[in-house]
Amino acid sequence: MPISCDRLSTQRSSATLRKVYGSAFYLIAAYAPHDVRRDNLAYRIAHSNNETQKGKYFPQAEHLILRDQEELGLSHGQNLRDTYHRADVFVDSTTDDTLAQSVGRFIELIFGNSLRTPSRSEYAMFHARAAALRSAELGRQVGAAIVRTNGDIVAVGTNEVPRFGGGLYWCDDKPDMREFVQGRDSNDEHKRNLIADTLTRLKRAGWLQPEKGSLEGTELVNAAIAGESPMLSRQSLIRNVIEYGRAVHAEMAAIVDAARRGVSISECTMYVTAFPCHLCARHIVAAGIRRVVYIEPYPKSLAAELYLDSIKVEGGSKCDDQVVFEPFVGVAPRQYMQLFEESKRKDDEGNAILFDAAKANLRYRASERLYLEEEDFLLKTLSSALIEKTLPSGGKDA
């Protein structure tokens, strides 16, 4: 019998359920523009306090939205930012009608309606993801696809090191000069050099505490960035520097790919697996692209802050004088081949087999024996961990 969980707000939770139930587990992410989420949440808060004026609760609603995105300082806190993009489908919850339509279509797909075919948006994002898989970058894989309004794909790109003669390195190019061959991430290396240079200058000027003043370059850097509570955490601005990498970013690679072939991308839409950084955003604007659709957030990006005049994030209504950046809605690339692969579409006489919800079966069924074994193993592991955490003797006195 299907079981639903109405809220998963940490990546660990979704990863655990996916590990236990495999293909029988589907993570559904509901999207609505920020203003809609804020208004709905403020309305619920007001209603719970027997009030009708939701406006006074906007600040509280904004606080809860930010907390849910990433609850800093808590290892098991809310972290929708790292969970949302791992979904199997993204549904539009802006209104009851759009939500019902999105969820209804997804249910038909998982119950084997092979006459449901990909939308232009799903097709484009799948190509962006396919392009991403070409990358061997040490950080992460990102892909982009530039698409005309009719769905034609005019260019794709991935984040990879450029090679002489144009384009990016392929796996069989000789010599292969991608970053993993050199054994290091050039951006991380230069960030460490920046930190070392800054700390060394502070040391020479006598600005460091005595116990830190005796440390040298590498020791200073490690003291600043290592440990459970480093002075320079991953959220510090200096550790968010991104411009020293050797790889061409996926968005730039797609734009350059079109330029090399003389293909116009004016008025096109770019589908990208992650929100563009501020370096790519300016090229997107300059190239004449009108719309950007993304899946994964990218907190390091300053695009919205730096280009308020030319970029609108989660635009909602159509904008004639700004590039709209909006989240993807539809079947995620991770489920594209599974849910859109054909099953039997006609009978022996050549008649179309139409979808019958009353007789439909799930496309994929998990082995009950296997997931029961996984559940049992997980419960034993959790029980042991809880006993060890609560008893100083590690559970020996239990």
Segments from the language model and where they lie:
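N-terminal helicase ATP-binding lobe
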Residues: 1-5, 9, 13
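Short active-site oxyanion
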Residues: 2-3, 26, 267-269
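Conserved phosphate-donor/acceptor-positioning beta-strand/loop module used by diverse small-molecule
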Residues: 6-8, 17, 21-45
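Small-molecule kinase domains that catalyze NTP-dependent phosphoryl transfer to phosphate-bearing small molecules
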Residues: 13, 43-103
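A short acidic, amphipathic alpha-helical/loop segment
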Residues: 15-20, 280-283
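Short glycine-/polar-rich loops that comprise or flank the Walker A/P-loop
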Residues: 21-26, 86-88, 289
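Terminal amphipathic helices with adjacent charged low-complexity linkers/tails
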Residues: 34, 38-39, 60, 65-66, ...
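Zinc-dependent deaminase catalytic domain
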Residues: 72-81, 94-398
